[in-house]
């Protein structure tokens, strides 16, 4: 009888521990990292107005428990991103929103080089079991049609090759509206960021759902 009582007590304790552990895992917010350049960093904006901050607030307003670290660096290129990817996105990150290439295009860097760097980052994240949401960029018109034809398809091609969700153009809805831009006519203002968040939300929400399904 004593053995049965001890065994029963042991089972109760184990069940309680497992239940508590499961609840703790369920309560843990999804941890994302926004990894990119000035468009991700929030150039000349207060930290609370950046894309990552506004996106986190919008997701939480919909009841989605998430934290989004801002690993955007103004002026960063794909080669700069590749050099810092491992330490900017720590192990244990649930997912990374990868946005780089705008400065490559502005500087006329070879699209083939940009694609190679982005692919190396994607492969590195995947080897660390960190899901990737890829954010697309388009070459500015002043770079010419030939450059655009080589640069613009990069993101779709990488998304298809690596099975990634893709948000095709980060500045969709902003790039042609000066009221949503800073005076430099290159970077979004606070209202512009809000438009970017609104337009990208469905893609980000689907990405988070995929992360949740993979963690079960």
Feature map (PLM): residue ranges:
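Bacterial N-terminal signal peptides that target proteins for export
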Residues: 1-11
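Alpha-helical cap/lid subdomain in secreted, periplasmic
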Residues: 27, 54, 64, 80-216
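N-terminal signal peptide c-region/cleavage motif recognized by signal peptidases
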Residues: 20-22
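N-terminal helical cap/lid subdomain that shapes the substrate entry/recognition surface
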Residues: 75-79
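Serine-esterase "nucleophile elbow" of acetyl-processing enzymes
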Residues: 24-74, 84-92
